[in-house]
Amino acid sequence: MPNSHKKIDSHHHFWDITRLDYPWMPAPPSVLRRNYLPGDLAQLLTRNEIDATVLVQAHQSVEEANFLLDIAEDTDFVAGVVAWVDLTSPDVGDVLDELMKRGKLVSIRHQVEDDPDLAWLSRENSIRGLR
């Protein structure tokens, strides 16, 4: 009986350095300082018999979240998107509602290592945003 389970790689990043600045990215001639888009990944997934991938944010902006969701809508092998939203914003619920309407939002993440406030998670506005 053939294996009917899908293989999903749960963490890939796509970026377009002409759209957003990625301050964490090393300066040229870094191998990272170029666009990484679906065409860069498609053959690798096929060669390794991976059926789908999940895109994970590399920039802390809703603009990038929409960019990744645009890609997800147009790319069959993208199973979902892990995006960033400002959990401390009073509008976080509305922003999440709009992103969820896009269809492939599967999670959100906050990069705590980049947050100067070590107590970020225990702040009242963060707790409110997580609810």
Regions found by a protein language model. Give the residues of each.
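Active-site gating/metal-coordination segments in enzymes
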Residues: E63-R131
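An N-terminally biased module of ancient metal coordination in phosphate/nucleic-acid-related enzymes
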Residues: M1-A72
